Amino acid sequence: MFRWGIIFLVIALIAAALGFGGLAGTAAGAAKIVFVVGIVLFLVSLFMGRKRP
């Protein structure tokens, strides 16, 4: 998940440097969503792993 977030961030930065506002905004939005989903999944796996049988 974090890999995809970093990829979208790099795409957004390159697009912003080249002046493509729409593409940069879309890639940045996708990067934010992927990052948040990754954080949520990490926290869920962290707490689910602490339970003892």
Swiss-Prot record:
The keyword Aminoacyl-tRNA synthetase does not apply. It holds the Pfam family DUF1328. It comes from the Bacteria. GO terms for cellular component: plasma membrane. It is a multi-pass membrane protein. Keywords: Cell membrane, Membrane, Transmembrane, Transmembrane helix. It is found in: Cell membrane. The chain crosses the membrane at residues 4-24, 30-48. The keyword Membrane applies. Belongs to the UPF0391 family. This is UPF0391 membrane protein YtjA. It comes from Salmonella typhimurium (strain LT2 / SGSC1412 / ATCC 700720).
